[in-house]
Amino acid sequence: MHEGVQVSSKLEELQALLAPVVVALGYECWGIEFSAQGRHSMLRVYIDKEGGVLVDDCAIVSRQISGVLDVEDPISVEYTLEVSSPGMERPLFTIDQFAKFAGEQVKIKLRSPFEGRRNFQGLLRGVEEQDVVVQVEDHEFLLPIDMIDKANIIPSFD
């Protein structure tokens, strides 16, 4: 099994374990990132709620998640847990999130090249089934969501 599949299944496991904890506390589990890099591995959990997330919210969720992680022990390497709001450069994880932010500028990095490129920056036009539609200059790309490694909103300061 190649590393991308291992990371993907680990993320699914973490999502299934942690999202219910976040939701039970009254927050939305916006997304989870896990980067396994030896002693510097990072588990980042993004939470959101109506009206925004405060530092105290992150601390509450972090304490609960830490307890669950200590009991369940799903990560075999040493790691740092970080709980944060999605922030202005909001990461996008799900097809519903891409649909919600149609009309925004986005930056997308793919796991492997698509039509000769891995990086796309342009207008998020929306979604079509499991594809994310991005307009870069005068060309529209339909990017399969399962090829997306990382996607973020580019904030506008108009």
Curated annotation (Swiss-Prot):
Entry keywords, A to Z: Cytoplasm, Ribosome biogenesis
BP terms from Gene Ontology: ribosomal small subunit assembly; translation
Membrane-crossing residue ranges in chain numbering: none
InterPro entries attached to this UniProt entry: Ribosome_maturation_RimP, RimP_C, RimP_C_sf, RimP_N, RimP_N_sf
Localization terms from the record: Cytoplasm
A GO term from the CC aspect: cytosol
Pfam families, per the entry: DUF150_C (PF17384), RimP_N (PF02576)
Family: Belongs to the RimP family.
Function: Required for maturation of 30S ribosomal subunits.
Classification via HAMAP family: RimP
Stated name of the protein: Ribosome maturation factor RimP
Organism: Pseudomonas fluorescens (strain SBW25)
